[in-house]
């Protein structure tokens, strides 16, 4: 049985590795993208169930990535991560369908709990 898929989108390698490890251990199948084009490619090919999306990414920003993801898969679940109180971006992303947001530096347990809430692992 295939595990639920999570895509981690962040230009910071350390954060991708950390989240990747945490959710792999939890039993999710994880994918990583460092930028918008990679992220959209993975969304198209792998159809992840949930995306952890950093809003501050060079090139295509988080809002643009979120908009394009929703075009590919309107039901995709997205949790956004922001570096600081970017209230406009948070508001806009929620209007675009983001489930919730976390400010960096985030508490890893809070993100883990949110992912489990929005994407419960199906028991085998």
Curated annotation (Swiss-Prot):
Q: Does the keyword Magnesium apply?
A: yes
Record protein name field: Sporulation initiation phosphotransferase F
- Does the record bear Phosphoprotein in its keywords? yes
Residues annotated to bind Mg(2+): 10-11, 54, 56
By its UniProt entry, which InterPro entries does this protein fall under?
A: Bact_response_regulator, CheY-like_superfamily, Sig_transdc_resp-reg_receiver
Q: Where in the cell is it found?
A: Cytoplasm
Function, as annotated = Key element in the phosphorelay regulating sporulation initiation. Phosphorylation of spo0B during sporulation initiation.
**Source species, please?**
Bacillus subtilis (strain 168)
Which one of the record's GO molecular function terms can you name?
A: kinase activity
Q: Give the E.C. number(s).
A: 2.7.-.-
Q: Which domain of life is it from?
A: Bacteria
- Annotated Pfam families: Response_reg
Gene label = spo0F
PROSITE patterns, alphabetized? RESPONSE_REGULATORY
For this record, the Gene Ontology CC terms, alphabetical, are: cytoplasm
**Residues bearing PTM 4-aspartylphosphate:** 54
Cofactor details (free text): Binds 1 Mg(2+) ion per subunit.
Q: Which terms does the UniProt entry file under GO BP?
A: phosphorelay signal transduction system; sporulation resulting in formation of a cellular spore
Which residues are connected by disulfide bridges in this protein? Answer: none
UniProt entry keywords in alphabetical sequence: Cytoplasm, Kinase, Magnesium, Metal-binding, Phosphoprotein, Sporulation, Transferase, Two-component regulatory system
């Amino acid at each position: 049985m295939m595990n639920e898929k999570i895509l981690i989108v962040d230009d910071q390698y350390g954060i991708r590795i950390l989240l990747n490890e945490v959710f792999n251990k939890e039993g999710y199948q994880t994918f990583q993208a460092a930028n918008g084009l990679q992220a959209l490619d993975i969304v198209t090919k792998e159809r992840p169930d949930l995306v952890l999306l950093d809003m501050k990414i060079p090139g295509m920003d988080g809002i643009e990535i979120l908009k394009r993801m929703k075009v590919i898969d309107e039901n995709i679940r997205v949790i956004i991560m922001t570096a600081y109180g970017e209230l406009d971006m948070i508001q806009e992303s929620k209007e675009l369908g983001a489930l919730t947001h976390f400010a960096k530096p985030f508490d890893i347990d809070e993100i883990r709990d949110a992912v489990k809430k929005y994407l419960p692992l199906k028991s085998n």
